[in-house]
Every structure is written in structure tokens, then in C-alpha cells.
Amino acid sequence: MERYEQLFKQLESRKQGAFVPFVTLGDPTPELSLKIIDALITGGADALELSIPFSDPLADGPTIQNANLRAFSSNVTPTLCFELLTKIRAKYPDIPIGLLMYANLVFHHGIDEFYRRCKDTDIDSVLVADVPMSESRPFRTAAMKHGIAPIFICPPDAEDELLREIASYGRGYTYLLSRAGVTGIERRGEKPLNHLVNKLREYHAAPPLQGFGISEPKQVKETLASGAAGAISGSAIVKIIEENLSQPEIMLKELTEFVSKMKSATQL
């Protein structure tokens, strides 16, 4: 949890926003997945948002759904993902690592056991994408017990009560949605969300990172101009993986270049 606090303090002192890439663990293979993480961090990623492959990722569009399928075809399991995470953490002891999960995977061995495993692997945060705030108590309780930051999604139409709950129960960062719907670059992020950012700040919520449809440096600049602390980009990154499956060296080079370009846009 403290890694996020340290990160945001460092970025503030450097007058920068955060750029956080998202990928699916094990896509397209476990070995290449580790090299992809290296490429993202070499490019300047401030934190990582990673998912464990799931058979029915409701919040995701076709690009990230295909990433899940590729990982499954490489026989990637949650156990293997935690082995990959252990290697990533050993190599990068300081970078914040967040997991984006679906509830069934958290339930599989029991909620408490899942968060204990996250603690043992030195994960910083968990966002459970298909659990609304009203059903989040057992998840956030287990998260806090094990020192894991519970991350909550703030939709663009969030009402005041939800904003207050996010501020009260969220830690690490707040996942600010650019728009409703599923992930993907096919639909761009909508207008800047100044009003939500201002309310979240007023209620002392964890710093907002804006995601969904972020695929260009210009959008990163707009996100920061709206007051968000940074941007998360997933589909644009996974698209680079998808388009270069047969040429991994080019894939890794393009990933590093993309992250570097997006990170450069975070200078305030």
C-alpha cells in the first residue's frame, strides 16, 4: 500500500503524473509475459496493473478478452500467475503492483486466502471489477487485514454517496472511468472529469487514475489537465502484443516506445 503513497509523492516533487500500463499475466506465454513486463518498466511505467486470466471478463472489450484466451491456450493458471508475480516483485522491489480481478477467482480458494496470497507475493492493491461497492465489505475487509489496498471504480456518473464511500473505503488509488461500457480503444475516453476529480479530492479519496480508452499522449495530457493523478492504458498496449505475436523482439521494442511516449506526456 505504501508504495502508492511513495510514488505519488515522488511524482509530485518531479511535477509529473503517473502512467500505468495494464496487461494480462501469461499473455501470450508465461516466458514472454515476463519480458513484456521488463519492456513496460524500461519504457518508464510508474506502476503496473495486471490481471489474472479469467474466462468471462465482463468489463473488457475484445482486445483484452483475446489476451485472456491466449493466456489460457498457454495453460496459464492463477497458481502460475502468482509464480510470475513473485519473479516480477523480486526483480522490481519498488514498483507498485496492482491486480485487476473478477470475483470468481477471488472466491476460488476463499476471500481471505486470496488476499493472504497477495500479501505473501507483496502485491500492493486489488481491484475486483465485478463487485459493486454495496457488496464489497468482505473483500475490502480481507484486503485491509492483509495490508492490500482495496481499489474502487468511480464511474463517470457517480453520485455523491458513492464518491463518499470510495473516499472512505478506497486506498492506494481510485480507478476513474473515462466512460461507461467495456475497455477498448475503439471507443475513446469522453470529456475530462473535472467535477468528479474535485469531489474526490474534497472527500480525501485516494488519488484518481483515469482509465478506459486511453491510447494517445494527448489523452494523457487531458487526463492530467482535468486534475487526475495519472492515466491507465490497457487495450492500446495489449493491441501491440496482439499485432506482433510472431515477432516478439519488435513487440517488446514497440511496447517500450509506446510507454515512453505516454510517460513523456505526464510532465506537468
Curated annotation (Swiss-Prot):
GO MF, one example: tryptophan synthase activity
Keyword list, A-Z: Amino-acid biosynthesis, Aromatic amino acid biosynthesis, Lyase, Tryptophan biosynthesis
Domain of life: Bacteria
InterPro entries: Aldolase_TIM (IPR013785), RibuloseP-bd_barrel (IPR011060), Trp_synthase_suA (IPR002028)
Coiled coil: none
Reaction equations catalysed: (1S,2R)-1-C-(indol-3-yl)glycerol 3-phosphate + L-serine = D-glyceraldehyde 3-phosphate + L-tryptophan + H2O
GO cellular component: cytosol
Signal sequence bounds: none
CDD domains on file: Tryptophan_synthase_alpha
Top EC class for this record: lyase
Any single Pfam family the record assigns to this protein: Trp_syntA
NCBIfam families (UniProt xref): trpA (TIGR00262)
Assembly: Tetramer of two alpha and two beta chains.
Family: Belongs to the TrpA family.
HAMAP family in the record: Trp_synth_alpha
Function: The alpha subunit is responsible for the aldol cleavage of indoleglycerol phosphate to indole and glyceraldehyde 3-phosphate.
Name of the protein in its database record: Tryptophan synthase alpha chain
